[in-house]
Amino acid sequence: MSYNYTTLIDNYINQSAPIGSTAEGRMSFRGDTLYSYKSKLFQRIAPNTYILDVAISKYSVTTAKHTMRILRAMPSNVTVYRTCIDNDPISNVIDYVSDIKYLISKFTRARSIKPQWQKQINRTYVELQSYIEFYKLDKRTTAYRQFKQLFTIMFEAKCL
């Protein structure tokens, strides 16, 4: 018998129960952390604010399906940061910056799908900006300086 993922996801999002699990533990949650096959997938860090672990979210077809089910079930006022749950915020900012630079390199070489790359770059930049504000990152850090340089790089690549 298969467990109803919808009930588990609703219980996690609404915190209707302290713990929950599907058949054979394919998906479960304990408190603020939701697991896919015992790997941390989502973690609530504040009301209506979650981290989606990008390293785990695409690990398998099933985990990718879990991710999409959860994202579709979340209310529109929820903020989801796509980073690594167990990393410190500065490491995550550096990862975001690296990801955006990679997206910019794809954008500059793209032809027919340039608008999609541009949209992805801008969405990720806004998400990073929100992440930095949420964690009140010290402006003297190297990670923050790298973030500030991104705007210039984006401007020069004409992807703003």
How would you name each of these model-derived features?
Residues 1-160:
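Terminal leader/tail segments of proteins
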